Amino acid sequence: MKLLLMLLFSGLMTGCRGNSSSASPPKLLLVSFDGFRADYLQNYEFPHLQNFIKEGVLVEQVKNVFITKTFPNHYSIVTGLYEESHGIVANSMYDVNTKKHFSDHNDKDPFWWNEAVPIWVTNQLQDNRSSAAAMWPGTDVPIHNSTPSYFMNYSPSVSFRERLGNVTTWLSSSNPPVTFATLYWEEPDASGHKYGPEDKENMRRVLEEIDEHIGELVHRLKVLGLWESLNVIITSDHGMTQCSKDRVINLDGCLDPSYYTLIDLTPVAAILPKINKTKVYSKLKVCDPHMNVYLKEDIPARFHYQHSDRIQPIILVADEGWTIVLNKSSLKLGDHGYDNSLPSMNPFLAAHGPAFHKGYKHSSINTVDIYPMMCHILGLKPHPNNGTFGHTKCLLVDQWCINLPEAIGIVIGALLVLTTLTCLIIIMQNRVSGPRPFSRLQLQEDDDDPLIG
């Protein structure tokens, strides 16, 4: 019985190794392939990525933050904060207090980034540690007067191989050692916008290229002797959904352009009214049934998208696959930014290294959960954040973890085993102490007349 209970307990929990003290601090490489939708893993072949997953862990779906855009979600990954908390609320922003504008071509002002502390800054505050980055959004900005010790200014023309070469060189030969590094690549986002995620031929081509990049990454780490000691996380910021010219919401047909300033367009449009806010809201409310219109104070709480001066007074959210346009707007065949509860908007996460289990699959975590997990791996004290470390414990070898579905199965199995053993014991006892052979009882009156004379 004691042995059975021990087996049951060990089955409910994943093993705990503990953080052993080591002369060299742990190292972590964070890689993002922009716009890598979670179900691409089921719909396309990824031999190199699947080998990576077999030797590590896979989170099948990561629920990202609203709005599901590139800059906001990349900052949520490295801060563990919702967009309303870290301040990067869109790819295009306007601050009403300072009158400043932000866009993907005008993103170098630390003002926009200083509302949070990204993990590369925290990492460098530790003794004998440095950080490195290959074009991760924000890493070429002096956030809180600090950039990574090694970084590349953003340029989309720089090849993946060059970015990878720089990052792996920094990880293998820097002093003080690089213990945290990031690597960003624009695909499959660019192709998803151009062709749409349902264009199987073109998407297969770009996804095969990404898989080759992952194979190149693994090979490079093995050549440099980093494969067994370096923790690697591969993830993304958002997914992608199909759009078409038949699913268009034309704002110019609903509202006079002189009534408002458009800060961000689609699929989440940010409206700054020039006239009475209620009048603008009322006109937009009846504009199109495929678009939700919210006053800032009425934005659903589940979006965590209210408490920032950079969120405009009126927000428009298109239904999945619908595009908000002006008369002169161009149309993309694929887009993102929609409701983060849509599976098409969610990415995945895969990880390998000494901190992670091997061959383990987990159904889902949140984007904001990645930050506290990374801090744990690096031994850093995290800044206040919206993530939950407990959501990622099952991925890590040094954490106790109750996996509820497995636990239920094990408990049911254990009860069946106990029931079977109990039945067997009862049957065996009955066999050992079976009925005695019949014998005639010697009665008192028989004493004078014994049976055998």
Swiss-Prot record:
Its cofactor is Zn(2+). Substrate binds at residues 91, 154, 189. One of its GO terms (biological process) is blood coagulation. It catalyses: P(1),P(3)-bis(5'-adenosyl) triphosphate + H2O = AMP + ADP + 2 H(+). It is found in: Cell membrane. Zn(2+) 1 binds at residues 34, 70, 237-238. Residues 429-453 are cytoplasmic. It is a single-pass type I membrane protein. Residues 19-407 are extracellular. Its main location: membrane. Disulfide bonds join 254-287, 394-401. Keywords: Blood coagulation, Cell membrane, Disulfide bond, Glycoprotein, Hemostasis, Hydrolase, Membrane, Metal-binding, Signal, Transmembrane, Transmembrane helix, Zinc. InterPro entries: Alkaline_phosphatase_core_sf, Phosphodiest/P_Trfase. Its EC number is 3.6.1.29. Glycans are attached at residues 166, 276. Pfam families: Phosphodiest (PF01663). Hydrolyzes extracellular Ap3A into AMP and ADP, and Ap4A into AMP and ATP. Ap3A and Ap4A are diadenosine polyphosphates thought to induce proliferation of vascular smooth muscle cells. Acts as a procoagulant, mediating platelet aggregation at the site of nascent thrombus via release of ADP from Ap3A and activation of ADP receptors. Belongs to the nucleotide pyrophosphatase/phosphodiesterase family. This is Bis(5'-adenosyl)-triphosphatase ENPP4. It comes from Bos taurus (Bovine).
